[in-house]
Amino acid sequence: MLKALEKAGILVEALPYIKKFSGKTVVIKYGGAAMVNDQLKEAVIMDVILMKLVGIHPVVVHGGGPEINGMLDRLGLKSHFIQGLRVTDESTMEVVEMVLAGKVNKEIVALIQRFGGKAVGLCGKDGGLIQAKKRFELVKNEGGARVPTDIGFVGDVVKIEPGLVRELADRGYIPVIAPIGVGEKGESYNINADTAAGELAQALKADKLVLLTDVEGILRDRKDPSSLISSLRIDDVPALVEEGVISGGMIPKVACCVEALQGGVGQTHIIDGRLPHSLLLEVFTDKGIGTMVLK
């Protein structure tokens, strides 16, 4: 009886959020452990389907780093690095596109269909969705100066054409997007999945951008999970970076959130994808589960 009452309480708590976000767009960056562990995969997919069933328009942008690395190893393609940055040559880009737009994307679509949802898989080339240009990374030369360096088919987003995604969502489908951009000459570019999700959220005028990660959120003390910062504002970010609270791989994720907020997205969230149903807990409960970044 106690468990039944708890479940009823959770449903009641979710009601105002369901009403608030019905008809709204939520862009979800899906990656990390939640893509590797079968139980977590199913939990994320069920969360996304439930969001759709209660009237929210979820849009999924996915990564696929481990799958790409596995396929490169299987094909015997060695990765070249410049100061820690992978150089994506033509052969590597072919594998990236094959794995992201083919294997990973269609697996997610099939899983959504299996659990009762309707999904359509896209990559950024479809309908000119993600238009991109070559990215030049600033890399230190022998003299210590940071100079623009060509790292291959890695791209920056130039423009998002969201019409196709919006139409699919309005027709009851869950769009699932592989972050492959298209250049002026039709060439493919590998786009960072966080960046692609943030840019798409802005173009769709999304109410929420949710980044699934392999950490609890932003912690004041990385060794203490209880030090989670449940919410912060853009103005708080510079000081937290200066203090080292936001550091390493969290810096580009927070920067993605800041840019999305400045581009008109309502709220952004960094949550722990290792926790089953973290997506629902963040969207539909009072306390949430990760870090919410607000304007």
From Swiss-Prot:
The keyword Nucleotide-binding applies. Substrate binds at residues 64-65, 86, 190. Its EC number is 2.7.2.8. Its main location: cytoplasm. Pfam families: AA_kinase. GO terms for cellular component: cytoplasm. The keyword Lyase does not apply. It is an enzyme of class 2 (transferase). Keywords: Amino-acid biosynthesis, Arginine biosynthesis, ATP-binding, Cytoplasm, Kinase, Nucleotide-binding, Transferase. The record marks 29, 253 as: Transition state stabilizer. Catalyzes the ATP-dependent phosphorylation of N-acetyl-L-glutamate. This is Acetylglutamate kinase. It comes from Heliobacterium modesticaldum (strain ATCC 51547 / Ice1). The lineage of its organism: Bacteria, Bacillati, Bacillota, Clostridia, Eubacteriales.
